[in-house]
């Protein structure tokens, strides 16, 4: 499953993001909430694309992430696999989902690093793509790492994503979005002893998992009530 591949490659992917901000930290684990969200999204994407089985898309995206394949390679496999006949649509799915995984990994790393205090939205639209004016306007916007950005959607609605391509955003704000978000390190926080920074990382993970357990119980309860 997609989540299994996500967990398999996480040490290398997330480790790189963590050490970029704090060389004293290493990958420990991904929080349960992030794992859950990525797994659920794999199914949702397949449903939106009206595929016969989400496992087909999972298999191709899994391979792309594990082997570091380019967007072009993943697109070709999606097309050759008969999942979607239209090239643009297939490329959009491959690109968006691979970048979305990296966004979640990057954000997870920021949250686990005590030296990271803020994050910045970076617009990196290609000249080959028609840039979204509302995303261009976000370039350089900085917020505290545990707070959402405020994005005015093309539909006029206000969204509060933690980063580009967050699951809370509609497809119209995610498809072919090349935006990134980067960590802003506090120089003063670098003065915290390495062992204390590692303790803070472990504490964050434990607290995040504990809070997610409560949140998941509420989600499951609501599903049972609605059913």
What is each model feature region?
Residues 1-84, 184-227:
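N-terminal leader/targeting and assembly helices and adjacent pre-domain segments
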Residues 1, 96-227:
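Activation/maturation switch segments at domain boundaries
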Residues 73-75, 89-93, 165:
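Extended, regular secondary-structure scaffolds
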Residues 80-85, 96, 100:
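A short structural micro-motif
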């Amino acid at each position: 499953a997609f989540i299994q591949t996500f967990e398999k490659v996480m040490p290398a992917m997330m480790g790189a993001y963590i050490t970029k901000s704090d060389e004293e930290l290493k990958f420990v684990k991904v929080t349960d909430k992030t794992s859950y969200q990525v797994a659920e999204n794999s199914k949702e994407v397949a449903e939106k694309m009206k595929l016969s089985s989400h496992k087909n898309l999972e298999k191709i995206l899994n391979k792309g992430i594990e082997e570091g394949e380019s967007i072009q390679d993943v697109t070709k496999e999606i097309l050759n696999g008969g999942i979607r006949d239209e090239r643009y649509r297939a490329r959009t799915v491959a690109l968006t989902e691979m970048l979305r995984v990296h966004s979640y990994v990057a954000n997870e790393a920021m949250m686990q690093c005590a030296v990271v205090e803020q994050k910045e939205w970076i617009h990196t639209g290609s000249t080959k793509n028609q840039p979204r004016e509302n995303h261009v306007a976000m370039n350089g916007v900085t917020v505290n790492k545990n707070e959402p950005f405020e994005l005015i959607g093309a539909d006029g609605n206000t969204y509060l994503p933690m980063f580009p391509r967050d699951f809370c955003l509609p497809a119209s704000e995610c498809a072919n979005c090349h935006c990134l978000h980067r960590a802003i390190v506090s120089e003063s926080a670098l003065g915290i002893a390495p062992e204390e920074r590692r303790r803070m990382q472990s504490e964050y993970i434990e607290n995040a998992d504990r809070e997610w357990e409560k949140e998941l119980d509420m989600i499951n309860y609501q599903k049972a009530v609605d059913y």
